[in-house]
Every structure is written in C-alpha cells, then in structure tokens.
Amino acid sequence: MARATGVAWTRDQRLIALNLYCKLPFGKLHKGNPIIKEVALKMGRTPSSLALKLCNFASLDPVLHARGIAGMSGAAREDRSLWDEFKANISVLGPQSEELLHNLLAFKADEEVDLLDHEKIQLQPSGTLIPPTGPTVATATVRVRRGQQFFRQSILSAYGVRCCISGINVPRLLVASHIKPWGEFPNERLDPRNGLCLSTLHDAAFDNGLVTLDEKLKVVLSKRLRAYFPQTALESSFVPYEGVAIRLPERLAEPSPDFLRYHREVIFKS
C-alpha cells in the first residue's frame, strides 16, 4: 500500500492508533519501533506520522501529566474528541479498535494480536473466552473476545507488565484483574479504572476477597487468609506486601476509589 502524505486520518486509523497508545509505553512511541513501522506500513502511512499521532494522544493522558510527561502539544480537535469518546464509551470502542487492529494484522479470526513485547507483533491463539452473560448474546462472542484482549493488554501494559503487588513480570503469569466483577458490571468491564495487573495467585486472592486495597492503595490481608498461616510459601507470597502501596499504572487511569470501596465492602472477607 502506498504511504499517505498529507492525507487526512480516517476515524478507523485514529482508533487503531489509540489502541496502540493504550498498549505501548511512552518510551516506545517512536518511528523506529518495529510495531509502529509495521502498523504504519499496513495503514498506508509513514512511521513518523503514526508515532506523532501516538504522542498527540499522550498529550491528552492525565496520568502521564501527573508524572510530568507532556507528550506532543497541538493534538488535533478530532484527536481530543475521539479521546473523550473513547473514555466515555470504552465498552464499544475498545473492542472496535481491537477488531480494526486484528483485521489489519492477523490472518485468522481466532488469533490475538499480542503487543506485550512492545517491539514485536506476535499472533497468539485466543485465550479462554469468558461466556457472555446478561444482555450479551452469542452473536456478540467475537466482540466480547476482542474486548477481553484489549482490556488485558492495555492493563498489563499500563502497569509495566508487572504485578502491581509483587512485581512479578512474567506475562504468562499475569492477569488483568477486575476490581468490580466482570459478570456483574457490564458497563465497567473494559474501564481501565476497574483493572489491576496481578499475578495469577494475587488475582485469585483478590477475586475471592482474601486481600484488598485500602484508601491509600496499600495491601490488606484478610483474617481468612491468615487462618492458613503458618505456611512458608503462602506467607512469603503475601506478608512482605502487607501495608505496602501497589505499583501505580504509568498511563490511562489509576484504580477508581469507588470501585475499590465496593471491593472492600462487598467482596473482601475481613
């Protein structure tokens, strides 16, 4: 495909770029990144153009601003509008952006476009799909899968592909954990404020109310978990982190205080 020069960005191209922004660290938003080069080629744009668009989105990210990172100034009105729309309607635009990226890069419907390497595109077999519930019907299965793929990669990437409690950085051992349960709150399923990057062990403990986070984002252990002490392996996985604040995400959104309050009051088994 010929590379566009001075050609206006389409809405679909902006959505693909915003999807990439959600998954790539700020330090990887440059024209030399192989992911940016390949996506730009498939889109018919230059790597410089795509990298600039990603940096424009970075200028709109409040978490980056809080870290003292400004991104590029002068984001287009269309970029600002899409950013606001994406935040307000992520349950629709998250899966849509993932499907657009998939159609651009993948060959099979059941492949996942994995960008967690941050410099290499990998096509992986899709993971286990959580069955649709409530108003979601079987015909929406692909959209649900794309949404889960988007949520997992964006949450893991926002936390630096590390468990926010333990610091474990093995992607296969990490989960994009939901603060408010996935099945009960469809409107918050893909909200980054409802996500934590946790190891599989800490995800299971959090999901079952054996650990929670206090108002200062410090780890709290339940009496039910402590009832299984002493066990060296168990204690070593939890006790060192008790009272320690979690690692915060590097972009997109910090955990919602309201969602965490719900977890403490409804799910946590003190």
Listing of model-derived features with the role each one plays in the protein:
Residues 2-20, 142:
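Short, Lys/Arg-enriched anionic-surface-contact patches
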Residues 21-31:
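Short helix->loop/beta-hairpin flanking segments within DNA-binding domains
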Residues 35-40:
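Short alpha-helical "recognition helix" segments of helix-turn-helix
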Residues 45-60:
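Major-groove recognition helix of helix-turn-helix-like DNA-binding domains
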Residues 46, 162, 175, 198:
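The −1 position to Zn-ligating cysteines in a subset of zinc-ribbon hairpins
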Residues 62-82:
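Short Lys/Arg-enriched helix C-cap and helix-to-coil transition segments
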Residues 123-162, 180-193:
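Short, charged surface segments at domain edges that flank catalytic/cofactor-binding sites
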Residues 150, 168-171, 180-270:
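A detector for short metal-coordination/catalytic motifs
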